[in-house]
């Protein structure tokens, strides 16, 4: 069956980024839930799905309680490391800031998004649907019961539109 000549895409067309299976080197850790990786000769910003850490880098916003600790934890765990990225079938490919939305797995198989939550460095970000939502919410409940990280009583936390925010 012949479908006709191949179409040539105009030069301004961009190819959507699909994460090829494999590991990618983390080139920068911006904060607790955002990293950059080297992917196919370019740098891609990656926002971790389903987790929210206190802000340290948001323009015109104060540094939030627990933010520096979450950033430091992510830097210690991920700076220069190789990670495996996984998309979520029910979430978008990119967010409004053009960051890839991904689950980030460490070389040993640890799901870093969930680790941030279970260690109290972040909280489940449930504003948007994602496959591991129940798992992440349970990890957050366990961290809260154990008074870990942001749940240790130092930060005054409130929930706003599916996000837990610090008032301290």
Predicted regions and their residues:
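Small beta-barrel nucleic-acid-binding modules, primarily SNase/OB-fold domains
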Residues: 1-168
